[in-house]
Amino acid sequence: MKHSLKFRTAQILDIQKFINLINSAYRQQQENSWTSEIEIVTGARINAEQLAQMLADDHFKLFVVEHAEEIVGCIGLTFNPIQVEIGTFCIAPKMQNHGVGKKVLDFVEHYVRDQMLPIHPNLTHFVMWVLSVRHELIAYYERRGYQSTGHIDDYPLSANVGIPIVGLHLVEMKKSIADRI
């Protein structure tokens, strides 16, 4: 990559760019994309109202990932009393398979350890939810030190994040904040 990645906190003005990025990465077939859910979920992955609500939540922080002055990714953190949920994680398809996702995940893990843990010392784990049929993503997160907890939840139809085409569940994965894998 000729230009380095830049990280900043998301702003309301970024919402439409995020909608385009997230829905294209998750709901359209793209060359080189391994995040596309086009064969398992139909409908929009996110909308403006959902993003605005997330950005207004004091317990949520969304990071913008920029490369050459273009938004190429995002990742969200939801802070609970003892854990940090990672979600809204998206890399533009053209930037996938170049180590960008690894750098973004590294960034938020370091951010939590270095910036948030001193303020919130009770934080113990990172947690994320992965679609049960996304075996390649589950394997990727396992290589990054996340482990399935055995907790499986129903696909959140009421969250308005798309309609499953196949039977789906969410698999909870956790990693100790102390682990630096």
Stretches with model-predicted labels:
Residues 66, 89-97, 130-131:
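A short, internal acetyl-CoA/4′-phosphopantetheine-binding micro-motif in the GNAT/acyltransferase core
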Residues 103-125, 147:
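Conserved acyl-CoA
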Residues 6, 23-51:
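Conserved GNAT-fold acetyl-CoA-binding loop/helix
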Residues 124-181:
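C-terminal "cap" of GNAT-fold acetyltransferases
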Residues 86, 97-108, 141:
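Glycine-rich acyl-CoA binding loop
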Residues 1-16, 176-181:
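Conserved N-terminal entry element of GNAT/NAT acetyltransferase domains
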Residues 64, 70-78, 85-90:
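Conserved beta-strand in the GNAT
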Residues 44-63, 166:
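A short helix-loop-beta-strand connector motif used in the catalytic cores of GNAT acetyltransferases and
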